[in-house]
Amino acid sequence: MIAQEREARINGEITAKEVRLISESGEQLGVVSVREALAMAEGQDVDLVEISPTAKPPVCKLMDYGKYKYQQAKKRDEAKKNQKQVQIKEIKFRPGTDEGDYQIKMRNINRFLADGDKVKVTLRFRGREMAHQQLGAQLLERVKEDLAEVAQIESFPKMEGRQMVMMIAPKKK
């Protein structure tokens, strides 16, 4: 039962008759019986850890298992820390967005793209503006043209209820 919880079998949990043994320093000690390997581990006051159970014979190493587990956890945490979570930022426009507001929104979109985030550009129609959807399409087309050198369009403008939506992702370097 305990063996399934751990990623590696240690000491008495190793079921093979013979193992390929590696010392603490990484030196190959050859193929030895499990009893012999366990005796060596006990003599050096370390654990016998099965590193590669699928090999024939299985590869085991003499090491401090607690220290090994700690280093594995540290490696896992480091890998997790280095992964960047891509976020989706949303910028909302209206069909009547003025030039000054447009420039500010474009500056924000550029900043989000520079940070590596995706941007969802939403154009919201209210009331009678629904009759002038071509104005919205023109505005999103302008956004697309202004961002041509820094972004790629992930999903082209499409209507979703009362809003037109377009997804933009940073260009791959």
From Swiss-Prot:
One of its GO terms (molecular function) is ribosome binding. This is Translation initiation factor IF-3. The keyword Lyase does not apply. Gene3D superfamilies: Translation initiation factor 3 (IF-3), C-terminal domain (3.30.110.10), Translation initiation factor 3 (IF-3), N-terminal domain (3.10.20.80). One of its GO terms (cellular component) is membrane. NCBIfam families: infC. One of its GO terms (biological process) is ribosome disassembly. It is found in: Cytoplasm. Keywords: Cytoplasm, Initiation factor, Protein biosynthesis. The keyword Chloroplast does not apply. Belongs to the IF-3 family. Signal peptide: none annotated. Monomer. IF-3 binds to the 30S ribosomal subunit and shifts the equilibrium between 70S ribosomes and their 50S and 30S subunits in favor of the free subunits, thus enhancing the availability of 30S subunits on which protein synthesis initiation begins.
